[in-house]
Amino acid sequence: MDRAHVETCAGISSRFVTMKYAILRWRYVVVLLAALCLGYRSTIAQTTVFSTGFELSEGYDQGFTLVGQPSTSTNGWVSFGSGGNGILTNFFEGQGQQGFIGFNPPTDTNVFFSVWKPLNFVPLTNDLPGVTFSVLMQIDPSTSTNHDDFRWSVYNSEGKRFFSLDFDGVTKTVNYALDDGLGLLSTGTGFENSQPYELVLTMNFKRNLWSATLNGLPVVNAKPITTAGSALDLGDIDAVWVIRAPGAPGNNYMFFDNYRIVADPISSIPPTLQIISRLPNGASVLQLYGEPGLNYTIEASSDLVSWTAVKVVTATDGVVDYVDSTAANFNLRFYRARQTQ
């Protein structure tokens, strides 16, 4: 099955998106509070599966498309369909060169155009079940009324799509799709054009789960990598241009940098902890995102040196709230979380 068939075009109802935007505006406030919250991650040795900054020093030449690089060190990129792609300079200020997809129209009426670097990595065979993909990305809008979607899609080595994280160019919402045929589902999160975002996709191939954060905020938590029993290995992670009106694409584009995939011998996806609010009595309301059924210890500190365990929680459904009623006793209160062995 080719990539045109395994990608999905399903949309989201405007009524549902409007409701979710109310949540999104509240979560922007949370970002300022959560900046004090330290996430916990084990210092286990990592293996770099693939990493590039698209720099000239790596062999990337701005005079060629991304999939047509002349250097033997950079010519491994592959594409499906046709469309604009290549190398830009300083679109992220001070970051050197970046890759991009979009802007120039396809030579035919294809709906999907994707570029990727073949990985063909087998996490379980290599005893590295934890795989993290991170990328700095930005979407610049069309100057016309034709707005398209851009997404990141993860495939196995057989070319079967596991899941996608989609950035809707019309509604400015972030949505996701699994391999269950149900189409795109809302994450409740929005994005802005012409703004940089750090996207992190974390996968646990041992437990068949994936999560996503955008600028450190969780947008997808503990969803199945595959619902169809597909082979659990990592074939590639694609940048995808989804053209809404075949034959009439927008001149929008997505550029990206610091494209990196690392693998760890972890047993679970590291948790994400947020401070949701502070109650009138001074208590802090925390929200922890983790893997379903696992226990996590929430720790607190007033100086970032000495840490005290304040609560062990169980993420029964992957998300759990905790109210720290002792927070009012401290002028400063920092939090972190770790999986309880």
List the model feature ranges, each with a label:
Residues 133-135, 195-205, 210-212:
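Short tryptophan-centered beta-strand motifs in secreted/extracellular beta-sheet-rich domains
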Residues 45-80:
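Extracellular carbohydrate-recognition regions
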Residues 57-60, 85, 91-174, 265:
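Secretory/extracellular carbohydrate-interaction modules
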Residues 28-39:
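Bacterial N-terminal signal peptides
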Residues 223-257:
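Flexible glycan-contacting loops in extracellular carbohydrate-active proteins
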